[in-house]
């Protein structure tokens, strides 16, 4: 690749992650997206007019309105001449947006792109099917759009949590292992919050309410009181006698994250120093019911493309869709657990599904910077049986 076709990341930022119906709930996804787009462009040091395109992931689009990414771009103050694309690759949406940006730069089509993801699970609507034709008699039923469009496997007609139980049986991951992993996720996230290690990667969000404007400036999910004993006391959430609980799964969340991706030539021409170079990316998949094993395939595909081994990466950020998923994938790939999710993961921080891919990458970039490391790998599984992976090298 030449400098013109080498993709680099100039900036990365995320909102704090809000709890379900928490501090960020009054803001729809495009408004959350606008916050991070505006801040990512500011941090990158580029003029808004220099942006060629905005690409944002968003999964729960019901009721959001036309062109969510376009809404976010306009609300961020970008000129109306800049096109925008909304993508839905379920939990991989935010990272796939960055991959699409890198592809556009490698193809020579564009030089400066804002990419990321946004989600407000709190604002997902309920649906009433059949109302358009009219319900002539009998009862109608409300369908939870958040679950139907975000957390429900359409192939097996079952909740993601049931497939997590299937994953636990297939991989042999025990309840105790899941709870221990979840407790560690909270402990690491709480330690990171107390040490202000998330401060650099987050932008405070102003939320207008009846009592005036409040500012959300910290992640709402990490719990100091999380412990192995407390988690062990929770009942299974999806199957009687199962091992997956509300404690070893992520929450329902709101948040957004965005990155400015440019060519190396663009960065140099504007006197800007990139955070990192995008070195490789890949997707992978299997049967829909095996979605939680899909990162194994995606990461192996990336390693083959990059000619690297898993041990070559100083830090790994793997989305914690469930503790069982993270454990099954890590064991199969031979991760050094001391390098994985060093500041906690989605079980503690939260999983705003369309935003998580960009959030994971953003957290990885700042963790590499904070620990003075060089090479990083980000990966997520996603509903339908696929996964995404992307690697970076700091500059």
Where on the chain are the PLM-derived regions?
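Active-site pocket-lining segment
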Residues: 163-165, 201-203, 209, 279-348
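Conserved active-site "lid/cap" helical segment
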Residues: 2-59, 63-64, 68-72, 76, ...
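Condensing-enzyme catalytic core mediating Claisen C-C bond formation in acyl metabolism
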Residues: 1-27, 228-293, 297, 362-363, ...
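Flexible glycine-/small-residue-enriched beta->alpha junction loops
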Residues: 112-166
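Active-site-proximal alpha-helical scaffold in enzymes
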Residues: 89-119, 162, 168-197, 258-265, ...
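Conserved catalytic cysteine-centered active-site region
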Residues: 58-112, 155-159, 225-251, 332-359, ...
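N-terminal extracellular/periplasmic Venus flytrap/periplasmic-binding protein-like
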Residues: 14-15, 26-27, 32-35, 43, ...
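Beta-strand segments within the central parallel beta-sheet cores of soluble alpha/beta enzyme folds
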Residues: 49-57, 83-88, 113-118, 177-184, ...
């Amino acid at each position: 690749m030449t400098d013109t076709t080498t993709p680099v990341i100039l900036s990365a930022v995320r909102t704090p992650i809000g709890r379900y119906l928490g501090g960020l709930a009054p803001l729809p996804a495009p408004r959350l997206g606008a916050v991070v787009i505006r801040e990512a462009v500011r941090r990158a040091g580029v003029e808004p007019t220099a942006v060629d395109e905005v690409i944002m992931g968003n999964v729960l689009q019901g009721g959001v309105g036309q062109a969510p990414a376009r809404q976010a771009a306009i609300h961020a103050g970008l000129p109306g001449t800049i096109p925008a694309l909304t993508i839905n690759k379920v939990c991989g949406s935010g990272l796939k947006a960055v991959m699409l940006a890198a592809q556009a730069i490698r193809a020579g089509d564009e030089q400066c792109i804002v990419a990321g993801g946004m989600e407000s699970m709190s604002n997902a609507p309920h649906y009433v099917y059949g109302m358009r034709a009219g319900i002539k008699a009998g009862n109608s039923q409300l369908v939870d759009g958040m679950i139907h469009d975000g957390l429900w496997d359409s192939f097996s007609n079952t909740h993601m949590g049931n497939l997590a139980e299937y994953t636990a049986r297939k991989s042999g991951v025990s309840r105790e292992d899941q709870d221990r992993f979840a407790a560690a996720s909270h402990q690491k996230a709480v330690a990171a919050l107390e040490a202000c290690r998330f401060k650099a990667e987050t932008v405070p969000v102003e939320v207008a309410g009846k009592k005036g404007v409040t500012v959300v400036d910290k992640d709402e999910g990490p719990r100091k009181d999380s412990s192995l004993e407390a988690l062990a006391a929770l009942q299974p959430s999806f199957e009687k006698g199962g091992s997956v609980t509300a404690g070893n799964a992520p929450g329902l969340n709101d948040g957004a994250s965005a990155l400015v991706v440019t060519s190396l030539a663009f960065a140099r021409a504007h006197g800007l120093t990139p955070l990192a170079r995008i070195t490789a990316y890949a997707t992978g998949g299997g049967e829909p019911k095996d979605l939680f094993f899909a990162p194994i395939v995606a990461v192996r595909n990336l390693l083959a493309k990059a000619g690297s081994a898993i041990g070559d990466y100083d830090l790994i950020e793997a989305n914690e869709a469930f503790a069982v998923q993270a454990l099954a994938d890590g064991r199969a790939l031979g991760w050094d657990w001391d390098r994985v999710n060093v500041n906690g993961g989605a079980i503690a921080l939260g999983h705003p599904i369309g935003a998580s891919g960009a959030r994971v990458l953003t957290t990885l970039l700042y963790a590499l910077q904070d620990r003075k490391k060089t090479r990083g790998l980000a990966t997520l599984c996603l509903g339908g049986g696929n996964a995404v992976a992307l690697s970076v090298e700091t500059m």
